[in-house]
Amino acid sequence: MENEKENLFCEPHKRGLMKTPLKESTTANIVLAEIQPDFGPLTTPTKPKEGSQGEPWTPTANLKMLISAVSPEIRNRDQKRGLFDNRSGLPEAKDCIHEHLSGDEFEKSQPSRKEKSLGLLCHKFLARYPNYPNPAVNNDICLDEVAEELNVERRRIYDIVNVLESLHMVSRLAKNRYTWHGRHNLNKTLGTLKSIGEENKYAEQIMMIKKKEYEQEFDFIKSYSIEDHIIKSNTGPNGHPDMCFVELPGVEFRAASVNSRKDKSLRVMSQKFVMLFLVSTPQIVSLEVAAKILIGEDHVEDLDKSKFKTKIRRLYDIANVLSSLDLIKKVHVTEERGRKPAFKWTGPEISPNTSGSSPVIHFTPSDLEVRRSSKENCAKNLFSTRGKPNFTRHPSLIKLVKSIESDRRKINSAPSSPIKTNKAESSQNSAPFPSKMAQLAAICKMQLEEQSSESRQKVKVQLARSGPCKPVAPLDPPVNAEMELTAPSLIQPLGMVPLIPSPLSSAVPLILPQAPSGPSYAIYLQPTQAHQSVTPPQGLSPTVCTTHSSKATGSKDSTDATTEKAANDTSKASASTRPGSLLPAPERQGAKSRTREPAGERGSKRASMLEDSGSKKKFKEDLKGLENVSATLFPSGYLIPLTQCSSLGAESILSGKENSSALSPNHRIYSSPIAGVIPVTSSELTAVNFPSFHVTPLKLMVSPTSVAAVPVGNSPALASSHPVPIQNPSSAIVNFTLQHLGLISPNVQLSASPGSGIVPVSPRIESVNVAPENAGTQQGRATNYDSPVPGQSQPNGQSVAVTGAQQPVPVTPKGSQLVAESFFRTPGGPTKPTSSSCMDFEGANKTSLGTLFVPQRKLEVSTEDVH
């Protein structure tokens, strides 16, 4: 048997040849009779049963089984084949024909869409059963059998049965089995539904909806009518009357789950739809009004279009079944806005049920809401059902009304538009702060003015707290000799100029020697607050007072120790290797510009030369010229870089003077006596063959009215070490910067040429005290300031004490002021001891009360040699 089965499965063609005698039909009948002597008349052989047992094992059978499981049509066809196998073989032959037909032919053979419509299907269903059946006869209905007979899906039969169940024409016995009642209880059921409809005030709802539609067409803003409370009092959370299926006495369904089935909504909707016809005065109900009442107007707004269309489709299904029962018929209502689909009641006239047997009406009990879960209540009560009653409408409304409503909505919402409000707020907020790109110059000017005003207020506070400067007797400059010093390099590189702050806000411009690659720097201060002068006590000669600032202490105290030095220029070769000089201050008309030209020799040569008697006389004349002159102190302020000049020995062009004196190549540093110490190293000077670095102190006298006309010094670079000249800055840029910073007045013009200073406007000159600045520690000597402050260690191991002098008391300058220059030289020489110098009070009685007295610290020069 196993071998036969293998042959049967593996070689079906051999099996066919063995069992099919038609292959020998070409031979004579005699031969056929010999081969098959016992066979009757020739017929088509039927499919053996063994093949059906072996089908699931073949790929074709498996594919057919999968297709039948997936496709409902094939599954239904297989079921029909199994049902009608015993009756006749015609359905099987018909199915075989459909299998061999193509797709288009198969669709043509199927019933059309009209034939499958619910109305036609309902007519066929009702034709199977009588309107008034005999109760003694079994009137059970099997839905599966009906679906097979009508050749439709079972779900289509369910739609018909649900509507008939709502009218109590059928009752449910079990799953897929119903009992047919016919029209025996139809009038009674309709009377019950009419009474319930009157209790729910469906007539008022229909009138209210029609009235609201009429008002919305002509007046959009008008709200709901006064009858809204009628609906709200009778509506549930779904927006329409919430009630269960209406049952009649004696016709209660025997199924326990009758009111909990999923298809309950269709039955309830069908009963409500019939109620609308029964309670309306003209028994014509449009589909739009029925949808608003049955589905709920708010649900029409909340639901999306797909769900709403599904609900409308359910209403059409109910209407088709009722039309098949000859209860309603489809008509069209013509109104102002066009033609609408509607249905007219054609059934029997029903009066409200007044019989003694009251119908069993199952409304939603109050305890049903209690049993409802809190989550469901929260989901239903989260949003109000009638929040926006006038905005969204049914899609079937006319476009004209929608356009009018949209226009009115735009007009009403225009004044309170959030976009316009934001723009207004942004414009108000941005009013005090305009665009920076459009108002950049004005903003910069405002910021500069605010900074200058703040600095002026700080200066006033500091001036109020400052005390008088203690006078110290000036040093008597030696007559016979001046020392020449060679300065070693300090820690700070050349060009790094730390600005030591000062209580005052005005300053004399300062130019420091720079490296060949870097520009010079000029320090400018606001001239508006430079009118501060002090009067020294009578009997003391005018000197220079330096002030130590607290901000300059700390990490830079060790580098702030400098020495005052002066020497005569004795060698032209050494002079050519030293940096250029600064421009002196502008002088008054009739006064001469006197300059002293210190000079030094290269190497470690230390020699002192006697000063001639003429220089001593000139110095005494300078001291006499200081009488009746009040000086003004200028601290350091702004550090402004200036390019270096490309030539040595530049001449100073003084404003208002034709004669100008030639300056030595040595650097002369202008500084304020209140500005403290500004150290400058000479390491870079040594790299460019600077044997020594000499500083000559100057005393400048400038009139108070022309404080803004402060001199600008030119610091020429060495042509030998820096062959490529650097261009000077534009004078327009310098003037613009200083004017906007408030450092100079608008009528003052600065010149950035190598040999010129500024052009003073006012002819009056104010006296300016310029303190000598020290460029570095001397080679072999250190200058110590006498002070009670303990000395701080220097990088070279020497102890240097820093003295902080008090600020002078400001007074008003008196009388006319003269221009004079005073030169203070470091006392002592290479052979003198450390404490050889003392204070000299000679010529003190020659100083008048109007002269500014600025005492100078006592200096001690050590004789230690540093190799």
UniProtKB/Swiss-Prot annotation:
Belongs to the E2F/DP family. The keyword Metal-binding does not apply. InterPro entries: E2F (IPR015633), E2F_WHTH_DNA-bd_dom (IPR003316), WH-like_DNA-bd_sf (IPR036388), WH_DNA-bd_sf (IPR036390). This is Transcription factor E2F8. The keyword DNA-binding applies. Changing residue 314 to A: Loss of DNA-binding and inhibition of E2F1-dependent activation. Impairs DNA-binding and dimerization. Induction: Following DNA damage. Up-regulation in response to DNA damage is not confirmed by PubMed:22802528. Atypical E2F transcription factor that participates in various processes such as angiogenesis and polyploidization of specialized cells. Mainly acts as a transcription repressor that binds DNA independently of DP proteins and specifically recognizes the E2 recognition site 5'-TTTC[CG]CGC-3'. Directly represses transcription of classical E2F transcription factors such as E2F1: component of a feedback loop in S phase by repressing the expression of E2F1, thereby preventing p53/TP53-dependent apoptosis. Keywords: Activator, Cell cycle, DNA-binding, Nucleus, Phosphoprotein, Repressor, Transcription, Transcription regulation. Residues 413-432, 532-556, 568-579, 775-800 have a biased composition (Polar residues). The modification Phosphoserine is found at residues 71, 102, 413, 417. SMART domains: E2F_TDP. It is found in: Nucleus. In contrast to classical members of the E2F transcription factor, atypical members contain 2 DNA-binding domains and regulate transcription in a DP-independent manner. Both DNA-binding domains are required for DNA-binding and are proposed to form an intramolecular structure that is similar to the winged helix structure of the E2F-DP heterodimer.
